[in-house]
Amino acid sequence: MKSFTSRRFREMYENLPEEVKLCAKRAYQLFRRNPAHPGLNFKKIDNANDIYSARVGLGYRALGQIDGEDIVWFWIGPHAEYDKLL
């Protein structure tokens, strides 16, 4: 599976604290090796739109939408904001 990021994701990422950016990079590397790794808690959260969630460190999540064999990451932020999106 190939990963891409939206402009919104990149803007949100740039505003994250440096330690969270590091966690995001580590999570992405892990995702590239094994999307099913239990540390990512990669799961479908919206069946109708093929939207998935992945853990980024302890307090952050990233959201992506599957499009064929690709995933487009479109949101990253604190778990509290993630809960509001659901």
Label for each model-derived stretch:
Residues 2-4, 11, 18, 56-86:
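Enriched for short, Lys/Arg-rich terminal
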Residues 13, 28:
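Short amphipathic alpha-helical/adjacent loop interface patches that line ligand
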Residues 15-18, 33:
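Secondary-structure boundary motif
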Residues 29-54:
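A short, surface-exposed loop/turn module that caps and links secondary-structure elements
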